[in-house]
């Protein structure tokens, strides 16, 4: 067996439709597009969301909400990630140095997810009630 002798199993690869190649092919002349109309023309068709001139759904419904610009610079930090920080002090800069949060992050909040085993000092970060209890139970402390 050689690479140049390999071929797919008989009948496993179906040939694509060859449109407009004569009446005998079954797909000649109009090529499966029917007669006349916008969809039969070259480049024909309507844009996404078009409902034939009726006011489309995306314009009938009211606008709502907004995209918070603060969300892009805020991060959640899991309790289990605190162990990845070198030294016992966790703040915004040490989290960035340990690649736990991105460089553009300005606010971080420690959440109760995973476990903290070593005592750590959390400085200048927001901390949830559950995370605060877990950090203090492990012998750590939170400084504002």
From Swiss-Prot:
The keyword tRNA-binding does not apply. Residues 21-31 have a biased composition (Gly residues). GO terms for cellular component: cytosolic large ribosomal subunit. The keyword Cytoplasm does not apply. SUPFAM superfamilies: Ribosomal proteins L15p and L18e. Keywords: Ribonucleoprotein, Ribosomal protein, RNA-binding, rRNA-binding. InterPro entries: Ribosomal_uL15 (IPR030878), Ribosomal_uL15/eL18 (IPR021131), Ribosomal_uL15/eL18_sf (IPR036227), Ribosomal_uL15_bac-type (IPR005749), Ribosomal_uL15_CS (IPR001196). PROSITE patterns: RIBOSOMAL_L15. GO terms for biological process: translation. Residues 1-54 are annotated as: Disordered. It holds the Pfam family Ribosomal_L27A. GO terms for molecular function: rRNA binding; structural constituent of ribosome. Binds to the 23S rRNA. Belongs to the universal ribosomal protein uL15 family. Part of the 50S ribosomal subunit. This is Large ribosomal subunit protein uL15. It comes from Escherichia coli O1:K1 / APEC. The gene is rplO.
């Amino acid at each position: 067996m050689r690479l140049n002798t390999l071929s797919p199993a008989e009948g496993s690869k179906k040939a694509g439709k060859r449109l407009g190649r004569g009446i005998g092919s079954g797909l000649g002349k109009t090529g499966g597009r029917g007669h006349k109309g916008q969809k039969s023309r070259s480049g024909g068709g309507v844009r996404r969301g078009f409902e034939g001139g009726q006011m489309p759904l995306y314009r009938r419904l009211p606008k709502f909400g907004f995209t918070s610009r603060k969300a892009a610079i805020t991060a959640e930090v899991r309790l289990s990630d605190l162990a990845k920080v070198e030294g016992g002090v966790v703040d915004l800069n040490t989290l960035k140095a340990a690649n736990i949060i991105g460089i553009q992050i300005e606010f971080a909040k420690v959440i109760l997810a995973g476990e903290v085993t070593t005592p750590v000092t959390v400085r200048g970060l927001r901390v949830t009630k559950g995370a605060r209890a877990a950090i203090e139970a492990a012998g750590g402390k939170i400084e504002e």
